[in-house]
């Protein structure tokens, strides 16, 4: 249960907009989670996203002790310094701190020694500051850092020398234009990368930038991509590229991502998806193609036996064929659709044959008609 509480707290901290929980509620949640590890933990626990091993020594929340940065609240190895108008990282952060919350301040720069000695640091939250620079040696001693939140700042590049222990990096809404080749070198624990709302173009992703990295979730929405990047990790389970400038999806674009389960391409400029494209992602369960310029249902959907959700609303689709969604081979086993959205397309909905949706969970799973008309 403790690990889920930690996940909930960190998810709230990364949400947009952020509504800070009361200090009392935050303390109660963290007390349940932050008693899990200490400096004597072995490497297996250090490499766990949600450490569960109990400490060898009894736990004492260090708000029993006087050491705490001025104006902050310290409890259960958490240092909570958000919304204080800080212009720099405060001193006197206890060495055994597991989580530092510095969001919603006015910090412009992270210096080399700001987190020096925090060898147990697990999560660092720096969302919504004015960061333009992070020293390349800042994270050399934070070798247990698993979650780093840098969203809503003014960073022009992904920080160098990130800890190899990092599992989640969120750098949404910054000014990042390039992902350099060695940015994630050796970061085998990185599983989640969220970097939407950055002015990133396709040529800004250098060849080999993700080489050797096992990332499961990447979101590069609200950027300047004109096509699906080809050099992302083949381990991807989720790829979200919504709100870009992608106009076509070619056969080779998804060939590298055969394990993909969720694909987000909504709110682009897609007019054509090449035949056979979706055969390259046979495990996909959810596809978002809403708010594009498609004139027909993409081919190959009926062959995706795990596909359950397909969003095609707000396109230019004029016709739906009886076999566009469901298998034509009687013995083929396919998951039932739980959602097919086709509303706000210039089609004559009354002409769609009932058999078109023979592999749908129920009538409520299909959305037709023109909303607002």
From Swiss-Prot:
Q: What keywords were assigned to this record?
A: Biomineralization, Calcium, Disulfide bond, Extracellular matrix, Glycoprotein, Leucine-rich repeat, Repeat, Secreted, Signal
| UniProt keyword Ribonucleoprotein, yes or no | no
Q: Name one GO molecular function term.
A: calcium ion binding
* Induction entry: By TGFB1. Induction requires ALK5 kinase activity and SMAD3.
Tissue expression as described in the entry = Higher expression in heart, also detected in kidney, stomach, testes, and skin but only weakly in lung, skeletal muscle, small intestine, and thymus. Expressed specifically and predominantly in the periodontal ligament (PDL). During tooth development, strong expression is seen in the dental follicle, which is the progenitor tissue that forms cementum, alveolar bone, and the PDL. Expressed in the perichondria of the maxilla, mandible, vertebrae, and long bones. Predominantly expressed in the perichondrium/periosteum of long bones (at protein level).
Quick one: effect of changing residue 219 to E? Partial inhibition of BMP2-induced cytodifferentiation
Signal peptide interval: 1-15
What does the entry's free-text domain comment contain?
A: The repeats LRR 9, LRR 10 and LRR 11 are involved in binding type I collagen. The poly-Asp region is involved in binding calcium. The LRR 5 repeat can inhibit BMP2-induced cytodifferentiation and may be involved in the interaction with BMP2.
Protein name from the UniProt record: Asporin
Task: Report which gene this protein is encoded by.
Answer: Aspn
């Amino acid at each position: 249960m403790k690990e889920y509480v930690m996940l909930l707290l960190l998810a709230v901290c990364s949400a947009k907009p952020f509504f800070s929980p009361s200090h009392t509620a935050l303390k109660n949640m963290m007390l349940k989670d932050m008693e899990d590890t200490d400096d004597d933990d072995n490497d297996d626990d250090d490499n766990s996203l949600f450490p569960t091993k109990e400490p060898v020594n009894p736990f004492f929340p260090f708000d029993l002790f006087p050491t705490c940065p001025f104006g902050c609240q310290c409890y259960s190895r958490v240092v909570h310094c958000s919304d204080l108008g800080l212009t720099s990282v405060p001193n006197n952060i206890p060495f055994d701190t597991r989580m530092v919350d510095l969001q919603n301040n006015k910090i412009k720069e992270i210096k080399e020694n700001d987190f020096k000695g925090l060898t147990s640091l697990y999560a660092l939250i720096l969302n919504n500051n004015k960061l333009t620079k992070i020293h390349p040696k800042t994270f050399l001693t934070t070798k247990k850092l698993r979650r780093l939140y840098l969203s809503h700042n003014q960073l022009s590049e992904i920080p160098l020398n990130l800890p190899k222990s990092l599992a989640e990096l969120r750098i949404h809404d910054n000014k990042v234009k390039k992902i350099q080749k060695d940015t994630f070198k050796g970061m085998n624990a990185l599983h989640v990368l969220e970097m939407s709302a950055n002015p990133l173009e396709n040529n800004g992703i250098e060849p080999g930038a993700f080489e050797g990295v096992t990332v499961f979730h990447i979101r590069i929405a609200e950027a300047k991509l004109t096509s699906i990047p080809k050099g992302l990790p083949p381990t991807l389970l989720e790829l979200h590229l919504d709100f870009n400038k992608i106009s076509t999806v070619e056969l080779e674009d998804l060939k590298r991502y055969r394990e993909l389960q969720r694909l987000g391409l909504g709110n682009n400029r897609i007019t054509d998806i090449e035949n056979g494209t979706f055969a390259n992602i046979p495990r996909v369960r959810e596809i978002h193609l809403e708010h594009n310029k498609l004139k027909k249902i993409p081919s190959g959907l009926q062959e995706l036996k795990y596909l359950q959700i397909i969003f095609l609303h707000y396109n230019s689709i004029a016709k739906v064929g009886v076999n566009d969604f469901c298998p034509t081979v009687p013995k083929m086993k396919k998951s039932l659709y739980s959602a097919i959205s086709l509303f706000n397309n210039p089609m004559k909905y009354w002409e769609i044959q009932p058999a078109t949706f023979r592999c749908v969970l129920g009538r409520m799973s299909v959305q037709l008609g023109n909303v607002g008309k």
